[in-house]
Regions:
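Fungal secretory targeting signals
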Residues: 1-19
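Signature for phosphate-centric chemistry
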Residues: 15-133, 137-324, 328-435
């Protein structure tokens, strides 16, 4: 399996009495891994799944074109200005970037295939008798991820259909309403979306300062900046994923520094896409209202980012399915988590002191939106209960629902869950998008 392979590639170190896995602190560049759960993620004894909504992020990818340009400029500058390389950084003298911008890596392809296979195995009782309805936003690597996921989904099915179910692609076009891709909330796109970067700055300056000093001592003449340091850290996961061996970039940084770097990204995400931003959760309201419609088998009621042409047509938005799977990118997933009220009890994250994931209710970027991230919204019928129950898992971690009287398994009745979605049902501040 992809996860086991990467762990073997990366190896382990220790911090305190616990094993430290570097790849669990790569933020959005982390490969998928099952996140620790205080509640057993297995389907509860005596319960039968009657509905599942999956939301998936694409697998591991190469750097995007803009980031690749920045990496190339940094490496070219280093190789021109540095003549004396220490042993630990000697590899930089001949290092060559071998990336294919924006494309999935071979590891990411396997990761996504495994995601589909895992989904089928978990929901086999439902999947063997019900076709999934699958949608995606229209970005190349995301669309490719759907095909890989479907291959994994059907891989272990004894009675395979003659053809895989089609994929409904929602165009990533400016001005085109799309619940799987942000872009239509003007105030967010032009202002609020950048607040995470501002919130990140104090911590970024604090944790990178000693690292930058150390690297400049190792690379005399490099004159590295904070941004350069972060880019060198990012080249660790990027090179590891494409080469299938642990990158030498990874060994330039300590376990504490990896945790600090992860927290920096967590701050940026929290203050852009989640509760730290007045319009962050708003970007997930449209999908949340679609989810309510699917759970209740009632028409969509929404005046935000839904596309009424699509949601009004049973061919593009059926209400009679038991398995729905949507593919998107990490930021949209995070906005959806927040619109759903997940992690709602997280206190505002400190901009100057690192808050560990366990103290932040699990709010850590690599726990939320790693490559091949997945959210499952399950509806189930449990013995002795008249009404169906709803619960949510994010990367194998049960996220206890809030505001609906959740039981010890983190579940709420369907009726109370829908009632608790007041933020989304009332428009989620969408009116502020155009002030």
């Amino acid at each position: 399996m992809a996860l086991l392979f990467l762990l073997l590639v990366l190896g382990f170190s220790s911090i305190g009495s616990q094993a430290f896995v570097t790849s669990h602190y790569w933020g959005t560049f982390s490969p998928f891994f099952p996140v620790p759960s205080e509640i057993d993620p297995a389907i509860p004894s005596g319960c039968q799944i009657t509905f599942v909504q999956g939301m998936m992020r694409h697998g591991s990818r190469n750097p995007n074109a803009a980031k690749l340009k920045q990496y190339k400029a940094l490496i070219e500058r280093l190789q021109k200005s540095v003549s004396n390389y220490g042993k630990r950084v000697k590899f930089l003298q001949t290092y060559d970037l071998a990336f294919d911008a924006d494309q999935l890596t071979p590891f990411g392809e396997r990761e996504t295939f495994d995601s589909g296979r895992s989904f089928y195995k978990r929901y086999q009782a439902l999947a063997d008798h019900n076709e999934p309805f699958i949608r995606t936003m229209g970005e190349k690597r995301v669309v490719e991820s759907v095909s890989l996921w479907k291959r994994g989904y059907y891989h272990d099915m004894d009675d395979k259909p003659p053809t895989m179910v089609p994929t409904n692609v929602i165009p990533k076009t400016e001005g085109f309403n799309n619940t799987l891709h942000h872009g239509t909330c003007t105030a967010f796109e032009t202002d609020y979306a950048f607040r995470g970067k501002e919130a990140q700055k104090p911590w970024l300056a604090k944790f990178t300062r000693p690292i930058t000093t150390r690297l400049n001592e190792m690379l005399p003449g490099a004159d590295l900046t904070t941004t350069d340091t972060v880019h060198l850290m990012q080249l660790c996961p990027m090179n590891t994923a494409i080469n299938n061996i642990r990158s030498e970039f990874c060994d330039l940084f300590t376990a504490e520094e990896w945790m600090d770097n992860e927290y920096s990204e967590t701050l940026a995400k929290y203050y852009s896409w989640s509760y730290g931003n007045p319009l962050g959760p708003t970007q997930g309201v449209g999908f949340t209202n679609e989810l309510i419609a699917r759970l209740t088998r009632q028409p969509v009621v929404d005046h935000t980012s839904t596309n009424t042409t699509l949601t009004g047509d049973p061919a593009t938005f059926p209400l009679d399915k038991k398995i729905y799977v949507d593919f998107t990118r990490g930021n949209t997933m995070l906005a959806v988590y927040s619109a759903l009220g997940l992690y709602k009890n997280v206190r505002p994250l400190s901009k100057t002191r690192r808050t560990p994931a366990v103290d932040a209710g699990g709010f850590q970027t690599s726990w939320l939106i790693p490559f091949a991230a997945r959210m499952y919204v399950e509806k189930m019928k449990c013995g002795g209960q008249d009404e169906e129950m709803v619960r949510v898992l994010v990367n194998n971690r049960v996220i206890p629902l809030s505001g609906c009287g959740a039981d010890k398994l983190g579940m709420c009745t369907l009726e109370r869950f829908v009632e608790s979605m007041g933020f989304a049902r009332s428009g989620g501040h969408w009116d502020q998008c155009f002030l």
